[in-house]
Amino acid sequence: MKIAIISSVYEQTPPLRYGGIERVLDFLVKGLKTKGHDVTLFATGDSSSPCNLVHFFDHPVVPYEPNAQIIHSQKACRYINEHNFDIVHNNVDISVGLKDLLKVPMVHTLHMDVLSKSKQFIFSHFKDANYVAISDKQRQNAESYGLNVVSRIYNAIDVENYSPSLHRGKYLAYLGNFAPFKGPHIAIEISRKTGIPLKLAGKVNAMGKEYFEKEIEPYLDNSNIEYVGELNDVEKREFLKNSMGVLFPSTWDEPFGLVIIEAMACGVPVIGFPVGAVPEIIRHGENGFIAKDVNEMCSYTKQLSNIDAQTCHQYVVNNFNVERMANEYEAVFNKILNTKL
């Protein structure tokens, strides 16, 4: 198949640091290429994913400019219509309307919260598009809003670049964005209640700056609670492997949560709340714990050493590898093309 994949203009594909969607798309490109498909990626010019690259912006657009993605997607649409593609895989919500302008079928993967007001405003006009959900919970939310979900495909990571930790460290880890709904302030509360050191890593963007300054910074002492900055892939794996466990205190319907499987691939268990896709990914007592509240999270920190590192790692190898993800997307593309015929 000749496949067009539309990525974002706000990060490279793959990203140097932050950028879960762009990272997953890079893995998908590699998986589809391995299967012999002709893949063209529409991304920023400094992207390094190993395929045909078409770009309209040389570098990620910073600061955020919403019109940049619209321009990128419209130009991609024109290019696709002129170059005989078989199918389009779109990953940018604001571009879902391209389905009515393209000469070939389009599949749109939902990466974000489909029930937010801004997303509903977009999706309400295109409920009949071919949507892929990245978790059962997200699929449930999308279908409750009337979206045409053709499949659920879990994200994947490059498991061959991960190995289980042989010697876990003595700190709890938080890895993610700094926003209230992500819960880093909850991670700090758990550290303070249990007395276990906490290291926080992730990007502080413009929207999260005030929250970080008010809710995170006052507790940083570089001893018990430390912010280590935004990490690249190598640094991230070391950060996770050297922890005793990862806190995933998200309080919203997280569509997936890539850090959960990244941690487990390092042989490190994860503690999270029963929201979004968390109950689908964490197997309670086997590769982590699902806590109903902060007190339960604190309690489960005492049981982290009971979780086997190899069990965590193998779970990700078996269920969240790139080959599985590529096979499932290939099946969806074939299904859409055969339906069209």
Residue ranges and their predicted role:
Residues M1-L341:
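Catalytic cores of nucleotide-sugar-dependent glycosyltransferases that transfer UDP/GDP/TDP-activated
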